[in-house]
Design a protein with these regions (language model features):
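Single conserved hydrophobic/aromatic residue that forms the stacking wall/gate
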Residues: 207, 214-216
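Eukaryote-biased RCC1-like beta-propeller repeat architecture
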Residues: 1-209
Length: 216
């Protein structure tokens, strides 16, 4: 009672909510530590996730979560599979002849050298983030060219998209969203840029490129 929600996000089986006071709450499956509560038990009802500063944005992937704080710092928790945590390459150990278990971050871990972030979005297996200057960063699973950084190799650390590093702020990014197998963003001239595969098309853009769709 008395808690007002500012924003939230859902993954495959978990949910994060941010209050207007900047507190972070989590609920749902915590099998991979994606709720950031330490233990891996299912989290029901919502529980407060301890953070050292106010939270302003969140995003959820299939087995990982991303949190942005008021200062622009980014924290991740959950499975290291696909490099989703942005802090290390996917690391695992064998638990059987054909079974692999990926290392987990059970509490929020800050991504080093990534500052000034104001917006974050997750696909099922990749992440895109936007900083206050309009620069865009991506990391995680790269198949089908969904990252838009010119490679289909997974990126375990944030990569800045070079084509938006421009002096003219009108050519920088205003908003970004990650889909299951694509990433889309809008620049300050209201142009739509797309990378990856979408609408079940067999075409993939390895770099973010302007699309003919009008936003007006």
């Amino acid at each position: 009672p008395g808690v007002s929600i500012h924003t939230g996000a859902t993954g495959a089986m978990h949910t994060l909510l941010v209050t207007t006071q900047g507190e972070l709450y989590a609920a749902g499956s915590n099998e991979f530590g994606q709720c950031g509560l330490g233990a891996l038990a299912t989290c029901v009802p919502f529980q407060l996730v301890p953070m050292t500063e106010r939270v302003v944005d969140v995003a959820c992937g299939r087995a990982a979560s991303v949190v942005v704080t008021e200062s622009g710092a980014v924290y991740t928790m959950g499975s290291s599979e696909d490099g989703m945590l942005g802090t290390c390459a996917a690391s695992w150990h064998h638990t059987g002849p054909s079974d692999v278990t990926y290392d987990l971050a059970r509490h929020p871990v800050r991504i080093p050298n990534l500052d000034g972030i104001v917006r974050v979005t997750c696909g099922e297996r990749h992440v895109a983030a936007l900083d206050r200057d309009g620069y865009m960063y991506v990391w995680g699973h790269a198949s089908l060219a969904r990252l838009g950084c010119g490679t289909q190799s997974d990126q375990p650390f944030p990569v800045r998209i070079p084509q938006f590093v421009r002096k003219n702020k009108q050519d920088r990014i205003r908003d970004v969203v990650a889909g299951t197998t694509c990433t889309m963003c809008v620049d300050n001239q209201e142009r739509l840029w797309i990378a990856g595969t979408w609408r079940l098309k067999a075409v993939s853009y390895t770099h973010l490129r302007a699309h003919e769709t009008s936003l007006h």
